[in-house]
Amino acid sequence: MRIDQSIINEIKDKTDILDLVSEYVKLEKRGRNYIGLCPFHDEKTPSFTVSEDKQICHCFGCKKGGNVFQFTQEIKDISFVEAVKELGDRVNVAVDIEATQFNSNIQIASDDLQMIEMHELIQEFYYYALTKTVEGEQALTYLQERGFTDALIKERGIGFAPDSSHFCHDFLQKRGYDIELAYEAGLLSRNEENFSYYDRFRNRIMFPLKNAQGRIVGYSGRTYTGQEPKYLNSPETPIFQKRKLLYNLDKARKSIRKLDEIVLLEGFMDVIKSDTAGLKNVVATMGTQLSDEHITFIRKLTLNITLMFDGDFAGSEATLKTGQHLLQQGLNVFVIQLPSGMDPDEYIGKYGNDAFTAFVKNDKKSFAHYKVSILKDEIAHNDLSYERYLKELSHDISLMKSSILQQKALNDVAPFFNVSPEQLANEIQFNQAPANYYPDDEYGGYDEYGGYIEPEPIGMAQFDNLSRQEKAERAFLKHLMRDKDTFLNYYESVDKDNFTNQHFKYVFEVLHDFYAENDQYNISDAVQYVNSNELRETLISLEQYNLNDEPYENEIDDYVNVINEKGQETIESLNHKLREATRIGDVELQKYYLQQIVAKNKERM
């Protein structure tokens, strides 16, 4: 399927690559560009660069990148057409795509979209059933008594599933949706004896569950009558996977980046109340342990995570287990310890929003400080525990990435062992990896003073050892990229076969085709114009190559002369072979080389 180029251009112009990439990668400004951990491969040192000026991104580790379309294709594993549609929806530009024109893989994506559509459509009627029907009055009163205002209910899209086995089933069927697909989406259940379908959620308050893009992919149905289970969640489906979903991430992402911290709670009800109280960087898992997928996504946003679990034994055990794992994953871990037996919802209900935000602000501890405070009685009364936990806490502190945070932890933890911070520091067994990283490759790093060392410009590693001829080819191409007039003036000055670097030869050919369709060169359009990742990398590397703002007199002509020397050298080589053929008396070879020389001379005329 072909999409009108004007639509593609409009979407590209309205989509800022920095905003787009920032939804997936925590970026820091380094010079004119932004840099962060690559979302396409595992790495500890940032190698993913975004150029706001040029509207491109590139990883010089795994080499992936491009403009907004290529980034979306890679990050979502979708086709170009789907990427255009996705970004079009993002900037409110309509793109008409018929599902029948997709291949099988795209059809799968289309099924996923239909599942999301079903969830979002039924949400409107769940909300109506809660706020406008007699059957929903008891559920609405239950929410209001627990501090849910009309505005909060609307903001969160909370609804009510009537006590009917076919409300959702009939609603979707009347609108032409595939009932089997609704079952696969988790909205319906199935009787395995007669294969009849019925509503999964009945007589429950419905809380929509959204993915990172803010689309509804599941529900949590809460009882208000005391029936079990207390919460009934959507099952695992193609669009709803608990190990990948963090509740409220779509709303909290901007605050997480701004505050450089994420606060993890146990349940989504705690998140709603905490967010309402003013704590905007809060998320929760869906009743599961924090998964590797969760941690990978968190690391792209921030390296600082605060755990605020329930103030009971189970919450304490979960805090210790989760915090230890996060610390080993290279995150800075903090803990807010709620009063015994309380969760955030209960704390806010008892003391109010202001008291809660003040408590969160003032009661934050490092994970090491929290851990030692939990274990203090055992440390004080058991020598074996004293030795064991001294080693454990020393190791925990050694895992902290900031020397300032380490010193703070030493000061907090040392009194529990009746030693000085200096004595505790002596016990620390640092990891085998050196504390300071000295870059010896293209990935950049940090010097001995903690200062960041810029990696090489995007894609330039492959052009480290260029010959005099290749350097001329690179500079010549860079000038041709300035404007179309320069290209037209010099295009016929060189023979493409004279390029010794095949990458540069292909770029020369691409420029010819590109300028045939465009009046102005820009890298964002150029990388979209080609299909080869290798060629995209070459284009990006040339974009990063800096020349004088204006060429000096005859500069481009000098490059042309160097490039054309290859042609002259070829003639000299043919003359040498002709003389050798004459010396040995091979008439056929003499004739062949003479024809080659004549042809070469004609090319240069």
Curated annotation (Swiss-Prot):
Residues where Mg(2+) 2 binds: 310, 312
Zinc finger (CHC2-type): 38-62
Cofactor notes: Binds 1 zinc ion per monomer.
GO molecular function, one term: DNA binding
The organism's place on the tree of life at top rank: Bacteria
Enzyme superclass (EC): transferase
Cofactor(s) this protein requires: Zn(2+); Mg(2+)
Catalytic activity, as annotated: ssDNA + n NTP = ssDNA/pppN(pN)n-1 hybrid + (n-1) diphosphate
Annotated domain remarks: Contains an N-terminal zinc-binding domain, a central core domain that contains the primase activity, and a C-terminal DnaB-binding domain.
Protein name: DNA primase
Source organism of the structure: Staphylococcus aureus (strain MSSA476)
Source lineage: Bacteria, Bacillati, Bacillota, Bacilli, Bacillales
